[in-house]
Amino acid sequence: KNHALVLDDCMLERTVRGIVNSAFGCAGERCMALPALCVQESIADRFVEKLLEISKELKIGPAYDKTTDLGPVVTESHKKHVEGWIQKGVDEGAKLILDGRGATVSGFENGFYIGPTIFDHVTEDMEIGQQEVFGPVLCIKRVKDFEEGLRMMNDNEFANGSVIYTSSGYYSREFARRTDGGMVGI
């Protein structure tokens, strides 16, 4: 499970666009997808507002259509698997702020489509924020500061990659030095 840490000095629009691409590109079915974010509380509301705005603009459609932003998941059984995880997140009490279940595409009504799905206020004890969903599902964990965000990221057993969004040279260096992610993005 790859993580990003979003600090309050990030370039907001650029950060959100990068995260949307990483979380929802390839329907979230790639090893380097970004399913989990630790967002500094002081920027979280503005971040979530912009994230919803951009995510709702994504065009869902067949993968071969060059205007498509979000294609289908690979199989019907995987669609059911991802939808099961979405329900699990709801049952655990995560705040579902964008629900991609029920997405349809005209002419492809039997396709395996799931729209962008975003949970906010995910806590450390929720499985939705700990396990690999492997679909277009993004979990937001609100954190007080760099230290809490880094700790949450490092406490997760999965760490293909990790990325920080900040304008701070200090936090960039600290992140690169201290993250457990296999690949590091700054």
Describe each PLM feature range:
Residues 1-123, 152, 186:
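ALDH superfamily catalytic-core signature
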Residues 5, 10, 59, 86, ...:
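Conserved C-terminal structural/oligomerization subdomain of aldehyde/semialdehyde dehydrogenase
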